[in-house]
């Protein structure tokens, strides 16, 4: 006997078994048996032997693999059997015998199928089937699961005297339910066997496991009795005799001798009353009493619950003493009982009361052996009686008043099982008054109970009921939130324990608390069942006095107070902001704070983004389920302060200070922050401020040299700022400029110079020329003015004089001048006249020779003078005006300088070389027919635009004598961007202001006449940070709906205009005016924005057109003429739809502004006329605001645009159809 796996039999002639079933010869038989220990025994019979030389092999199949066994070699006797230890119990195996004779394998003689026996059930549990314990049971069996196979379970038991058995397969996890047993019957000797089944060759094998568990027994519950009813009869006490019976003499119930008095029967309200038997007399029962005796064949049955009035805990589940079982002291029997008799002198004269209890047998086919009767009175006395199965009535006498409870149950006791009672039928509860009257049980609970919250402290209950035999209600209220709070932190006291009231209004509630209310109906001392509990909550009132205290750029402290009356679980602190990571704005919870008894609370919120807009909200969340919170209106908004910038570099050259700084780190987001701009401040003897847009972190300041400046950069938001650490910069003093020697005499000379920057004093030193070391040295003279007279000089002597500026004890580089004193004998007047004559002759000759050669250079110098080269020599006067002789000498010198300089010098000294009374207001004109315009342009452009230059020089003389006193007021000087671009008084725009101070109505702006109106335009400078509020005030007061901006805020590292509008769509207040950017559209060369400005209850829409491709002091490129004309036409189309003057500005409000106005007027003029007068147009504009069309280049550009307008008009006959159509930008 041995176990031979496949693939190991080649040496023993078993290799052919694996695949060589070639030759079929002999058919044999063999024997297979299965033992109890799960061994399969295979033995050979004598008839199986073919030849002793043959090999006999057994194949076992059934498990996951096949097993092969070879019989031992034998001669005369049969070999011992082959034994296979089966792994599985309850599994079928196929046994095959194979004979190998040489290399020939016979066909298997036959295959025998055997089935092993499954392992038995080890334990059994039997339970009631809770939905139906009368007919149903739950079986739970336990058995070995590993290697145990079965298909069904055989259940055997004795049903009374009958034996039952059945095969059952609906077991799930070892459990199944029987729901067809008989009620009240004893089932015994219950056993379970596992059954294995197999089908092979149309034959079925079945094996049963043994029974190893203890046999079980179980009795089903009997059904309860039906149609229980009770009758009451008041007995005449004088006629009553002591009957014989089993009741004690002092019992509170006694069996009656006869029935005298009124007969009353009480039924379950849900059951149908039965017809009384003929031998029972009935009185006149009330409406809920039936005279019918129950039908013995009735099968009506209803399972009911225990009464609610008897156990006071049902009315007061948390406090059993809340409801008193005894009759209340103020109980009035005349008003509370349905039927009442006047009490006699003896309150117990109506006793004893005879009670007759009747019932019907339980629903068939219930097996039962009798009935149990339970009589209770006020939990003090209990009688438990048993009657046999034939009894259907029980009579007793009640000797005392009180609350009674009756119940009748069925019991079953026959058989070997334990005695079992039925579930209790609905108990009968009633009250017997001292007068013998009875009150039936209240069985209905209040329906549709609801609570309506009237206020934060009161609520009103409502309900419905079909019963009308109750006279009051009980409202039981308990707080569900009180017990959730720690006693030390408890915020409510009133309803922490159950409180009962007879009023429907619930008072003294606390906001934020959650309550549960139960209602009972009450009649006399009887209390009905409780209603379904109703839960309601009072919304919290929310916090108040929410305050915010900033702690720097990234942290704030929120503090608030809670209402005195209120209960809640926690505070929830939320914040709303734009998240630059997710690019979304949403409310997020930052922190939760547990509720405390403290009236105040605070929280520190950190890790905020600097210069960011936040909304904070604090809500109170209740304990209830679901949670309630209040209130979303408890919010506060705040813009965090920016972080302090850090100045990284400061460089000074060419009289300009270059400052650079950094802000935050690489992750700092400026594009979505509330950063408005930077304020760069240089504070020395003069404080200089400059506003820089937030996207630029460099600034250029023109600082007077010679001073020590405290530099700082301030990051500004709408509500706060943060300043960098200061940086001290000391600028070396500059040498005096324009040093002149005037009013020379034989022994003295007067030196005159211009101060450059800041100087504490000047040191003047004169040394005689050619004296060598023996010359007399003059002592240095320290002066604080710009004029000094050096005396004690030698006549007719040459001196080298120097003037050095001193500032903060630091000297500048000296400025030198060579002077000579007058000769004693010579008349000074003759010398002066001679010198002037020689100088005049030389000057005239020089001008004639170099006029053509230096023309371009002269014009370039004029342009380089710019707006910032004006020097007011009037400041040189310290004590009155300069002497006339000085002024003449200065004039003679200044005529050598370019006209842009000396005209300002002359005006500064009030010197007019052309006229004693000055130039009057002039009107120039030069009309040109458009048909001749091309040839006119060619003629004007000859010799490097020489004739254009002559015309433009004449334009410079316009308006020199027009006053601008308002602009020169000290209060208004800071409102001017450039000191030499000032508005004329007669045409300036005056602001309406409640402030009557001088200069309150001033803004650097002038009315300019147009093609349609004498005040069609307002030309103004680009707003300064100090004047942006006045700018918006002008827009609102002038009812302007169009603003044209012809500059960028920063050009060539210089600030040209303040960013006077909001960066984002968030409204910003400029003084009393709020500006909101509704929309913004970007084109290739310009941007258009829609603003809405609000003041009080007034709103005004404004369109803002910003042309960004126009260089300062210049003109757009030649190929951009189409673009600028398209822009002008776009603005004109919008202007046609609105009223009020158009506001036009660039930086100074004269160059690009004048060019735009000229093009807009000419565009309208050419549409209706065949000539133009550009010279007259510019002359007229300059008579309303100085320097309109500021450069000659701009003046020529206007002519080029007119040439293009006329060309398009000639080509298309309608200029607007072609040149101004909206073309897409590539």
Swiss-Prot record:
MF terms in GO: cadherin binding; protein homodimerization activity; protein tyrosine phosphatase activity; Wnt-protein binding
Entry's transmembrane regions: 833-853
Annotated spans, Disordered: 242-305
PROSITE patterns, per the entry: FN3, TYR_PHOSPHATASE_1, TYR_PHOSPHATASE_2, TYR_PHOSPHATASE_PTP
Positions of glycan attachment: 75, 154, 227, 279, 471, 500, 710, 743, 800
Binding site for substrate: 1112, 1146-1152, 1190
Basic and acidic residues composition-biased segments: 260-270
Enzyme class of the recorded protein, top EC level: hydrolase
Lineage: superkingdom: Eukaryota
Residue span, Tyrosine-protein phosphatase domain: 948-1205
Membrane topology: Single-pass type I membrane protein
UniProt-listed Pfam families: fn3 (PF00041), Y_phosphatase (PF00102)
CDD domains xref list: FN3, R-PTPc-O
Places the protein is found: Membrane
Protein family membership: Belongs to the protein-tyrosine phosphatase family. Receptor class 3 subfamily.
Task of the protein: Possesses tyrosine phosphatase activity. Plays a role in regulating the glomerular pressure/filtration rate relationship through an effect on podocyte structure and function.
Name under which the protein is recorded: Receptor-type tyrosine-protein phosphatase O
Species this protein is from: Mus musculus
């Amino acid at each position: 006997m041995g176990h031979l796996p496949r693939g190991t039999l080649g040496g023993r002639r078993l290799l052919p078994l694996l695949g060589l079933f070639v030759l079929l010869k002999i058919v044999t038989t063999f024997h297979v048996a299965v033992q109890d220990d799960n061994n399969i025994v295979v033995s050979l019979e004598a008839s199986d032997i073919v030849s002793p030389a043959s090999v006999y092999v057994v194949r076992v199949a059934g498990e996951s693999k096949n097993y092969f066994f070879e019989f031992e070699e034998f001669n005369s006797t049969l070999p011992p059997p082959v034994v296979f230890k089966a792994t599985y119990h309850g599994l079928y195996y196929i046994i095959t015998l194979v004979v190998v004779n040489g290399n020939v394998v016979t066909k298997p003689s036959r295959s025998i199928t055997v089935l092993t026996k499954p392992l038995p059930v080890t334990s059994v549990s039997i339970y009631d089937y809770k939905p139906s314990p009368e007919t149903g049971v739950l079986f739970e069996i336990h058995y070995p699961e590993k290697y145990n196979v079965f298909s069904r379970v055989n259940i055997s038991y004795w049903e009374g005297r009958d034996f039952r058995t059945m095969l059952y397969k609906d077991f799930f996890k070892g459990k199944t339910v029987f729901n067809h047993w008989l009620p009240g019957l004893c089932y015994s000797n219950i056993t379970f066997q596992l059954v294995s089944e197999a089908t092979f060759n149309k034959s079925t094998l079945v094996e049963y496991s043994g029974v190893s568990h203890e046999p079980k027994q179980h009795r089903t519950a009997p059904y309860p009795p039906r149609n229980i009813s009770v009758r009451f009869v008041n007995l005449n006490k004088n006629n009553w005799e002591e009957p014989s019976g089993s009741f004690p003499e002092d019992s509170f119930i006694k069996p009656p001798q006869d029935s005298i008095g009124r007969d009353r029967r009480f039924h379950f309200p849900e059951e149908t009353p039965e017809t009384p038997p003929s031998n029972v007399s009935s009185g006149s029962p009330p409406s809920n009493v039936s005279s019918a005796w129950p039908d013995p064949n009735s099968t009506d049955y209803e399972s009911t619950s225990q009464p609610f009035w008897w156990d006071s805990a049902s009315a007061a589940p948390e406090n059993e003493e809340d409801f008193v079982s005894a009759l209340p002291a103020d109980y009035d029997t005349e008003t509370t009982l349905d039927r009442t008799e006047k009490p006699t002198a003896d309150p117990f004269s109506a006793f004893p009361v005879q009670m007759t209890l009747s019932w019907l047998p339980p629903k068939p086919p219930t097996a039962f052996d009798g009935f149990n009767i339970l009589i209770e009175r006020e939990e003090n006395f209990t009688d438990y009686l048993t009657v046999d199965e034939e009894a259907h009535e029980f009579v007793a006498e009640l000797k005392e008043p009180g609350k009674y409870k009756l119940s009748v149950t069925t019991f079953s006791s026959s058989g070997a099982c334990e005695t079992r009672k039925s579930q209790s039928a609905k108990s009968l509860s009633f009250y017997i008054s001292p007068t013998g009257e009875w009150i039936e049980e209240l069985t209905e609970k209040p329906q549709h109970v609801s609570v309506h919250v009237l206020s934060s402290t009161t609520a009103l209950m409502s309900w419905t009921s079909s019963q009308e035999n109750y006279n009051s209600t009980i409202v039981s209220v308990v707080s569900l939130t009180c017990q959730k709070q720690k006693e030390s932190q408890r915020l409510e006291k009133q309803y922490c324990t159950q409180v009962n009231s007879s009023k429907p209004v619930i008072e003294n509630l606390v906001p934020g608390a959650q309550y549960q209310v139960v209602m009972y109906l009450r009649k006399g001392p009887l209390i009905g069942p409780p209603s379904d509990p109703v839960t309601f909550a009072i919304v919290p009132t929310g916090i108040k006095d929410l305050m915010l205290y900033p702690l720097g750029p990234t942290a704030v402290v929120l503090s608030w107070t809670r209402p005195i009356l209120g209960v809640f679980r926690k505070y929830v602190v939320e914040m709303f902001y734009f998240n630059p990571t997710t690019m979304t704005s949403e409310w997020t919870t930052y922190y939760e704070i547990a509720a405390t008894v403290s009236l105040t609370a605070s929280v520190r919120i950190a890790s905020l983004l600097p210069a960011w807009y936040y909304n904070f909200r604090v809500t109170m969340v209740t304990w209830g389920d679901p949670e309630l919170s209040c209130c979303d209106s408890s919010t506060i908004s705040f813009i965090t302060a920016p972080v302090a910038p850090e100045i990284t570099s400061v460089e000074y050259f060419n009289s300009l200070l270059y400052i650079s700084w950094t802000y935050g780190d690489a992750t700092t987001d400026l594009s979505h922050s509330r950063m408005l701009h930077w304020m760069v401040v240089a504070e020395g003897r003069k404080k200089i401020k400059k506003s820089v847009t937030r996207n630029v972190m460099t600034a250029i300041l023109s600082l007077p040299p010679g001073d020590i400046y405290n530099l700082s950069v301030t990051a500004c938001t709408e509500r706060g700022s943060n300043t960098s650490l200061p940086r001290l910069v000391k600028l070396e003093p500059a040498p005096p400029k324009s040093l002149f020697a005037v009013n020379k005499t034989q022994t003295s000379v007067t030196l005159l110079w211009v101060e450059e920057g800041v100087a504490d004093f000047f040191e003047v030193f004169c040394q005689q020329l050619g004296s060598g070391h023996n010359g007399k040295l003059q002592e240095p003279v320290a002066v604080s003015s710009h004029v000094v007279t050096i005396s004690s000089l030698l006549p007719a002597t040459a001196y080298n004089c120097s003037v050095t500026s001193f500032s903060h004890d630091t000297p500048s580089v000296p400025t030198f001048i060579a002077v000579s004193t007058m000769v004693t004998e010579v008349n000074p007047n003759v010398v002066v006249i001679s010198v002037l004559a020689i100088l005049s002759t030389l000057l005239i000759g020089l001008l004639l020779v170099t006029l053509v050669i230096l023309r371009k250079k002269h014009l370039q110098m004029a342009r380089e003078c710019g707006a910032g080269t004006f020097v007011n020599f009037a400041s040189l006067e310290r004590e009155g005006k300069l002497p006339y002789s000085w002024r003449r000498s200065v004039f003679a010198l200044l005529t050598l300088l370019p006209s842009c300089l000396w005209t300002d010098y002359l005006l500064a000294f009030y010197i007019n070389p052309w006229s004693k009374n000055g130039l009057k207001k002039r009107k120039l004109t030069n009309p040109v027919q458009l048909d001749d315009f091309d040839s006119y342009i060619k003629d004007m452009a000859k010799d490097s635009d020489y004739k254009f230059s002559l015309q433009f020089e004449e334009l410079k003389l316009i308006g020199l004598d027009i006053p601008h006193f308002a602009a020169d007021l000290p209060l208004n000087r800071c409102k001017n961007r450039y000191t030499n671009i000032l508005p004329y008084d007669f045409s300036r725009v005056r602001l309406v202001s409640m402030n009557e101070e001088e200069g309150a109505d001033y803004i650097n702006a002038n009315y300019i006449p147009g093609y349609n109106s004498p005040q069609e335009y307002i030309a103004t400078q680009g707003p300064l940070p100090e004047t942006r509020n006045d700018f918006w005030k002008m827009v609102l007061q002038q009812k302007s709906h169009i603003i044209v901006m012809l500059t960028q805020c920063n050009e060539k590292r210089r600030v040209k205009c303040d960013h006077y509008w909001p960066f984002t769509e968030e409204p910003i207040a400029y003084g009393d005016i709020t500006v909101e950017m509704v929309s913004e559209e970007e084109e290739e060369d310009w941007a258009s924005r829609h603003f809405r400005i609000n003041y009080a209850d007034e709103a005004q829409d404004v369109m803002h057109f910003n042309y960004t491709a126009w260089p300062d002091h210049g003109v757009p490129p030649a190929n951009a003429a189409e673009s600028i004309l398209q822009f002008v036409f776009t603005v004109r189309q919008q202007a046609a739809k609105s009223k009020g003057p158009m506001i036009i500005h660039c930086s100074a409000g004269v160059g690009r502004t004048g060019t735009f106005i000229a093009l807009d007027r000419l565009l309208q003029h050419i549409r209706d006329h065949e000539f133009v007068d550009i010279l007259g147009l510019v002359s007229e504009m300059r008579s309303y605001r100085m320097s309109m069309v500021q450069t000659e280049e701009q003046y020529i550009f206007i002519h080029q645009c007119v040439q293009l307008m006329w060309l398009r008009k000639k080509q298309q006959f309608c200029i607007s159809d072609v040149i101004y159509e909206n073309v897409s930008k590539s």
